[in-house]
Amino acid sequence: MSEFTIRLARPEDQSGAYHVCMKTGNFGQDGEPFYREDPDALGRIFVGPYLAFEPELSLILEDEVGVCGYALGAFDSRNFFHRYETEWRPKLCAQFHEPTGDPAMWSRVQNVHSWYHHPDYFTPEPYEQFPSHLHIDLLERAQGRGFGRRMLEQVMDKLRERGSPGARLGVSMLNTPAFGFYAKLGFRELIRVGEGKDGCIYMGKSLRNESVR
């Protein structure tokens, strides 16, 4: 039986965490068939900045095979996005050209490369109640064992200890299991943006006056 360990992320975890991001990058399912031309495309947005800017809020799940999950947090979303804009995104834009041609014909990778040049920093209101945000992904072999809940609870505990009043996260409208998972953890729907494969449900949870366990 596999033994799993939850620990703080280290710089050398980046490649493994990027792999997890890609393998869960098809609305929670395996994204490898769509990102073979650039397997790290998603990870550069949804993993790398957290490991760099919020190492104390970045947890890694690993087993004897390697990294199989992560839970990431940002204490102040607006400050995090400011650092992403000024410190992280310029490097992406310099390395990856903005795609041209008809966007309807772009590959998944081209769409992500376009996000490098045209990021979305949407923060649902009321911001003051949910200034922090979270992101989590687990490979299939690590799912259904309670690790997702434990990791999110640990990150939320860290946020609460630092004084955050609440945290939010975004869920694809096509990822119904994830919506149910977060609802069981006490997250409630804040707002829906877009529709279909481009739609996102933002959910929030108060961290005031309670343990998240």
Describe each region flagged by the PLM.
Residues 129, 134, 145, 149-150, ...:
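Conserved active-site alpha-helix within GNAT-family acetyltransferase domains
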Residues 78-135:
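Conserved acyl-donor/pantetheine-binding loop and adjacent beta-alpha core of acyl/acetyltransferases
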Residues 60, 66-75:
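Conserved beta-strand in the GNAT
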Residues 143, 152-160:
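A conserved short alpha-helix in the GNAT/GCN5 acetyltransferase fold that borders
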Residues 1-12, 209-213:
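Conserved N-terminal entry element of GNAT/NAT acetyltransferase domains
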Residues 130, 159-172:
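Conserved GNAT acetyl-CoA-binding A-motif
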Residues 78, 170, 183, 188-203:
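Conserved catalytic-core motifs of GNAT/GCN5-like acyltransferases
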Residues 26, 35-58, 64:
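Active-site rim helix/loop that mediates acceptor-substrate recognition in acyltransferases
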